[in-house]
UniProtKB/Swiss-Prot annotation:
Known pathway: Lipid metabolism; fatty acid beta-oxidation
Summary of subunit composition and partner proteins: Heterotetramer of two alpha chains (FadJ) and two beta chains (FadI).
One Gene Ontology term of the molecular function aspect: enoyl-CoA hydratase activity
Site (Important for catalytic activity): 118, 140
Reaction equations catalysed: a (3S)-3-hydroxyacyl-CoA = a (2E)-enoyl-CoA + H2O; a 4-saturated-(3S)-3-hydroxyacyl-CoA = a (3E)-enoyl-CoA + H2O; a (3S)-3-hydroxyacyl-CoA + NAD(+) = a 3-oxoacyl-CoA + NADH + H(+); (3S)-3-hydroxybutanoyl-CoA = (3R)-3-hydroxybutanoyl-CoA
GO cellular component: cytoplasm
PANTHER family (UniProt xref): TRIFUNCTIONAL ENZYME SUBUNIT ALPHA, TRIFUNCTIONAL ENZYME SUBUNIT ALPHA, MITOCHONDRIAL
Function: Catalyzes the formation of a hydroxyacyl-CoA by addition of water on enoyl-CoA. Also exhibits 3-hydroxyacyl-CoA epimerase and 3-hydroxyacyl-CoA dehydrogenase activities.
Protein name: Fatty acid oxidation complex subunit alpha
Annotated spans, 3-hydroxyacyl-CoA dehydrogenase: 306-714
Annotated keywords: Cytoplasm, Fatty acid metabolism, Isomerase, Lipid degradation, Lipid metabolism, Lyase, Multifunctional enzyme, NAD, Oxidoreductase
Compartments (UniProt record): Cytoplasm
Length: 714
């Protein structure tokens, strides 16, 4: 048996070589540049052994095959040429695996992503487990890159160009059955027999390539290909607004390989990989990846977390139902919902049923697993079943007296160790805990709507919250699949505080005559997933504007909304999508209904709807106020670091990921340039644009928030 640091070669008695991948000291297998020589040494031995019948690659990790390439390798490249050389090295290694004269099979269990899937594609056959942990994909586009070790060339030839483009352009991950249906894998088996099935496949002749569906064969021809790339190009441009250069390069590289052959395709792939690695977009996206990984490792405090065996929820509304779902179905914890109205409990239970039933229909979940997860959720109209809950999340109406009453009731009806977590979006946690007998166990846990989709939670300790309460709440959030940031107990916390001036400015521009669709389109073009006016409609105008008076009382008139505009809209019974009318009008088909701007909105707010500003001018006014407020939050220690500030903005409100978050964006512009822009806007539009003191000082000194590397703070 030949040992290497990450690869073990074992030749079985039946002359099948099993190469076990196990990167020492790491939970996940990732490919590193230094492994190339190790793999080549093994390939040399395989070629020298004339008795071998086949080869199987398998992972020793319990839940991943290969999670991708080590992203630090890209960060270490100083030039496009260095990154291109890295890609060519990967391509060459995969080519050597593919060129082995005997069948090579990948036995896949767990994540098989990026470079891991490229290695599997270089094999002659693939078998994977039917485990939910098994996913296959090429997520490089999410880091502003493209697959650089042959993925753009091998995948289209294996599963067809249109399906391959969808995977590569979106980073979409396939489950086992989807992969089998598309021909990405040759078999799906239980984990217990994975290796034996792969070995048997390796004993046969090389698996012949499955004939592509007729549609894919047509699209691979010159006419079909031209039409496909034109259509996909238009769709991609509309989705990315031209902000992500990787998607354009992916289309170019895949088309080059199909039109000019694999040699030209591999060459184009390596060159594009090198160039994309040096783009500011890729650097920003990689910084978000590193920051989010870092946040997920952050325990929140130095104290050890308390055990978490069960959770209670007060309120069965939209938020309560969503929190119950992620607690039971993601965290796997028993949940007890209390609502004074049985209909509230039914609503919360139906919410989880709808989510899980959708997964069953899409064949992502077995019906038996759905029933098992639903069995974790129960309901009550009183406090029966709450006596031993470790943590109780309050998701009732946004009213201070009511929330204080909830604290008192929970303390009377739960254990001495029970934590009370409030899902408030605006009320100070210190005020909610004001009359608590155990204030050290009261904390804020702010989810964003819709709960099952939004990745961020804000965890808000008040001055008296214990370190263990913080650590335990952070632990729960991670179990729920969330990315938690710990923020200070100040009005608006972090996300809503930086969002409010952004939305206020959009409303102000409406009153000045800019059109709803122009404002929204300008911010989508800038890189936000939706514009500020549409966002307000989606959240609910009544809900979204409730925080403005709270912020105005705390921080003064820079948070003032345009006079009487919000009240005029609410008095006209406009709440947004939830009641079918806001700034937009909605059809009758729920969230998927088409919307159109309601022209009646302009006279209602006393505006003409005849704008004069360009899209960049509109975006500049909204975004600069957000940046200024984010810097104030650092200065006032509302957030613990600019890392948390960037993650909070990207994951909480969809700040453009390709800009890396507010603080990376300020660094890319230069603090001095941001100050100059804000001073110009202050002269034009008023003192709300006055740059904060910290920004002015940083601009004068030429300072930045981040160091030059993707992972370190100054």
């Amino acid at each position: 048996m030949e040992m290497t640091s990450a690869f073990t070669l074992n030749v079985r008695l039946d002359n099948i070589a099993v190469i076990t991948i196990d990167v020492p000291g790491e939970k996940m297998n990732t490919l590193k540049a230094e492994f190339a020589s190790q793999v080549r040494a093994i390939i040399k031995q395989l070629r020298e052994n004339k008795e071998l019948r086949g080869v199987v690659f398998v992972s020793a990790k319990p839940d991943n095959f290969i999670a991708g390439a080590d992203i630090n390798m890209i960060g270490n490249c100083k030039t496009a040429q260095e990154a291109e050389a890295l890609a060519r090295q990967g391509q060459q290694l995969m080519a050597e695996i593919h060129a082995l004269p005997i069948p090579v099979i990948a036995a896949i269990h767990g994540a098989c992503l990026g470079g891991g899937l490229e290695l599997a594609l270089a094999c002659h056959g693939r078998v994977c487990t039917d485990d939910p942990k098994t996913v296959l994909g090429l997520p490089e586009v999410q880091l502003g890159l493209l697959p650089g070790s042959g993925g753009t060339q091998r995948l289209p030839r294996l599963i067809g160009v249109s399906t391959a483009l969808e995977m590569i352009l979106t980073g979409k991950q396939l489950r086992a059955k989807q992969a089998l249906k598309l021909g990405l894998v040759d078999d799906v088996v239980p984990h217990s027999i994975l290796l034996e099935v792969a070995v048997e496949l390796a004993k046969k002749d090389r698996p012949s390539s499955r004939p592509l569906p007729v549609r894919e064969r047509i699209l691979a021809g010159p006419l079909g290909r031209a039409l496909l790339f034109k259509m996909v190009g238009k769709k991609t441009e509309h989705k990315t607004q031209g902000n992500y250069p990787a998607t354009e390069r992916i289309l170019e590289v895949v088309e080059t390989g199909l039109a000019q052959g694999t040699s030209s395709g591999y060459d184009a792939e390596a060159r594009a990989f090198g160039e994309l690695a040096m783009t500011p977009q890729s650097q920003a996206l990689r910084s978000i990846f590193f920051a989010s990984t870092d946040v997920k490792k952050d325990p929140g405090s130095d104290a050890p977390p308390a055990p978490l065996n069960s959770v209670g929820i007060l309120g069965g509304g939209l938020m309560g139902g969503g929190i119950a779902y992620v607690t039971a179905c993601k965290a796997g914890l028993p949940v007890r919902i209390k609502d004074i109205n049985p209909q509230g409990i039914n609503h919360a239970l139906k919410y989880s049923w709808d989510q899980l039933e959708g997964k069953v229909r899409r064949r992502h979940l077995k019906a038996s697993e759905r029933d098992k997860q639903l069995a974790l959720i129960s309901g009550t109209t009183d406090y029966r079943g709450f006596a031993h809950r470790d943590l109780i999340i309050e998701a009732v109406f946004e009213n201070l007296e009511l929330k204080q009453q909830m604290v008192a009731e929970v303390e009377q009806n739960s254990a001495a160790h029970t934590i009370f977590a409030s899902n408030t979006s605006s009320l100070p946690i210190g005020d909610i805990a004001a009359h608590a007998t155990r204030p050290e166990q009261v904390i804020g846990l702010h989810f964003f709507s819709p709960v099952e989709k939004m990745p961020l939670v804000e965890i808000i300790p008040h001055a008296g919250t214990s370190a263990q309460t913080i650590a335990t709440t952070v632990k729960l959030a991670k179990k729920q699949g969330k990315t938690p940031i710990v923020v200070r107990d100040k009005a608006g916390f972090y996300v809503n505080r930086i969002l409010a001036p952004y939305i206020n400015e959009a409303i102000r521009m409406l009153t000045e005559g800019e059109r709803v669709e122009h404002i929204d389109a300008a911010l989508v073009k800038f890189g936000f997933p939706v514009g500020p006016i549409q966002l307000l409609d989606e959240v609910g105008i009544d809900t979204g504007t409730k925080i403005i008076p709270v912020l105005e009382a705390a921080y003064g008139e820079r948070f003032s909304a345009p006079a009487n505009v919000v009240s005029s809209i609410l008095n006209d019974d406009r709440k947004g999508r939830k009641n079918g009318r806001g700034f937009y009008l909605y059809g009758q088909k729920g969230r998927k209904s088409k919307k159109q701007v309601d022209p009646a909105i302009y006279p209602l707010i006393g505006a003409q709807g005849q704008g004069r500003l360009s899209a960049p001018q509109v975006a500049e006014r909204c975004v600069m106020l957000m940046l200024n407020e984010a810097v104030r939050c650092v200065d006032e220690q509302v957030i613990r670091s600019v890392r948390d500030g960037d993650i909070g903005a990207v994951f909480g409100i969809g700040f453009p990921p390709f800009l890396g978050g507010p603080f990376r964006y300020i660094d890319s512009l230069g603090a001095g340039e941001v100050v100059a822009i804000m001073q110009r806007l202050a002269t034009q539009y008023g003192s709300r644009f006055t740059p904060c003191e910290r920004l002015v000082e940083m601009g004068a000194r030429g300072e930045s928030f981040w160091k030059t590397t993707a992972t370190d703070l100054q």
